Amino acid sequence: MSGDGHDGDEVLDELFEVIESRKEELPDGSYTASLFTHEKGENAVLEKLGEETTELLLAAKDDDDEELAHEAADIVYHLLVLLSMKDMELADLRAELRKRR
């Protein structure tokens, strides 16, 4: 673990802001925007979460730390997209995690 302090919070906040912005503006060529307009709707994100979870499990099984971090980041990203699709906030996730301390 690195000594980044609350940098992780800032990264998540910034990422969620970008996701929310893409949801509103739907810029051409944006992968994030394409998830909000996909013909499968939220099922596209749910499928992606399943795919990324499988890849994360394989990376863990193979003791591939670099790939594990990569796949974990993919899961977090797609989870944040799903929260946005459900009109939830990052604060909702944080509140639930605080309850579990």
From Swiss-Prot:
It catalyses: 1-(5-phospho-beta-D-ribosyl)-ATP + H2O = 1-(5-phospho-beta-D-ribosyl)-5'-AMP + diphosphate + H(+). Signal peptide: none annotated. One of its GO terms (molecular function) is phosphoribosyl-ATP diphosphatase activity. It is found in: Cytoplasm. Belongs to the PRA-PH family. It is an enzyme of class 3 (hydrolase). Keywords: Amino-acid biosynthesis, ATP-binding, Cytoplasm, Histidine biosynthesis, Hydrolase, Nucleotide-binding. Its EC number is 3.6.1.31. One of its GO terms (cellular component) is cytoplasm. The lineage of its organism: Archaea, Methanobacteriati, Methanobacteriota, Stenosarchaea group, Halobacteria. Pathway: Amino-acid biosynthesis; L-histidine biosynthesis; L-histidine from 5-phospho-alpha-D-ribose 1-diphosphate: step 2/9. PANTHER family: HISTIDINE BIOSYNTHESIS BIFUNCTIONAL PROTEIN, HISTIDINE BIOSYNTHESIS BIFUNCTIONAL PROTEIN HISIE. Pfam families: PRA-PH. This is Phosphoribosyl-ATP pyrophosphatase. Its main location: cytoplasm. It comes from the Archaea. GO terms for biological process: L-histidine biosynthetic process. HAMAP family: HisE (MF_01020).
